Amino acid sequence: MSERTTLCTFRLDGHWIGIEVSSVQEVLRHHPVTSLRWAQEAVQGLLNLRGQIVTAVDLRCVLGMPPRPEQLTPTQVVVRVGAAAVSLWVDEVGDVVELDAGACERVPGTLSRMN
């Protein structure tokens, strides 16, 4: 019997991507973000999530994709990274799916620092 993994899926510029559901803290819509004037382009700002300060990152920018159309409001997937949390801006959230671990592609080496 092959090993199974459960993923929270989301769409970015027409591509479906998944992250292990155990890493997902919650999904937010229309949560206010405070901009940071001198932050890197991908950093959209900070949000206060029940007293926890969370960095908001636009995955389109990180992955070199075109900017999100203005009429498309991003959905925020808050993921746990060690003791911290990061809000990943995505186009839309899909389903939670269970797949054979072998059916999933590994994270590209260019993104390994985000692992």
Regions flagged by a language model, labelled:
Residues 1-115:
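An acidic, low-aromatic, low-complexity terminal/linker signal
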